[in-house]
């Protein structure tokens, strides 16, 4: 599905370059080269593609010290599981206040349809009894897909199911004590993406904008999440590519306050040098 051009299509150098770029973006080949050769007649071309295999598995381990204290992480990733281009990833993160782990499987070309299908399992345990006076444990399951609805317009629906247990200390504030209990959620989330980048792999021009929303289907403490993520790219010179990125999220409780674990904070990868949860 990464090849935009097919046998018998009118020749387009632009579409050939996009196809090669898509192959590089899959991150399962060490090198991808192509040649455009003359065909049996003047109006025919032969495209010869040469790929170099590489190890598609990755193991990552890390440790750090920052404004949130000490953190450790370990991840295993496979970009070509079973030789079918399926992405398999598992990750464990440990900080002073939270332990989280997840495993996800993403088939970017499910049943040769060109549509992506993914499934994920997330488990986390948070202990903030020494600061805000609560601790929580959460187990969640996600199932979703992503496909190109119109040219350069992608739709990504998903279903999230989660169970969470929140315990509150007796010394916590009255506002936090109201959040104690067991919660079961079933949410419907979707994203609409407009992708006008010149290429998926190392873009040099264009933009990518995504609007995403989460709506409660079955939820003990209902809230609606809205977000916008935008990236633009511009090539100032052959060796200098500039980018501008905008990210915003908001969450609104429907009938009561937003649950403690659902409240929003700026991700550390978006704003560095500050303590999270502040």
What are these regions (language model features)?
Residues 230, 246:
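Charged catalytic cores and adjacent phosphate/nucleic-acid-binding surfaces used
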Residues 4, 9-210, 223, 233-234, ...:
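Gram-negative/organellar outer-membrane beta-barrel architecture
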């Amino acid at each position: 599905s990464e090849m935009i051009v097919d046998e018998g299509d009118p020749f387009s150098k632009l579409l050939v370059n996009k196809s090669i770029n898509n192959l590089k973006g899959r991150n399962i080949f060490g090198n991808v080269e192509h040649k455009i050769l003359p065909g049996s007649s003047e109006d025919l071309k032969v495209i010869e593609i040469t790929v170099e295999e590489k190890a598609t598995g990755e193991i990552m381990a890390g440790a750090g010290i920052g404004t949130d204290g000490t953190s450790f992480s370990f991840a295993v990733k496979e970009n070509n599981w079973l030789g079918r281009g399926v992405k398999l990833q598992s990750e464990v993160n440990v900080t002073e206040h939270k332990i989280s782990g997840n495993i996800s499987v993403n088939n970017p070309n499910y049943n040769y349809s060109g549509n992506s299908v993914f499934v994920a399992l997330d488990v986390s345990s948070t202990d903030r009894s020494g600061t805000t006076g609560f601790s929580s444990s959460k187990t969640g399951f996600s199932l979703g897909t992503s496909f190109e609805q119109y040219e350069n317009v992608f739709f990504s629906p998903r279903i999230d199911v989660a169970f969470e247990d929140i315990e509150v200390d007796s010394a916590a504030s009255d506002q936090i004590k109201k959040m104690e209990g067991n919660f079961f959620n079933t949410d419907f989330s979707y994203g609409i993406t407009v992708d006008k980048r010149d290429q998926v792999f190392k873009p040099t021009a264009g933009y990518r904008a995504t609007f995403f929303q989460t709506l409660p289907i079955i939820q003990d403490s209902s809230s609606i999440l809205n977000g916008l993520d935008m990236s633009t790219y511009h090539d100032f010179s052959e060796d200098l590519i500039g980018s501008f990125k905008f990210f915003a999220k908001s969450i609104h409780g429907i009938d009561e306050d937003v649950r403690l674990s659902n409240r929003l904070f700026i991700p550390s990868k978006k704003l560095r040098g500050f303590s999270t949860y502040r």
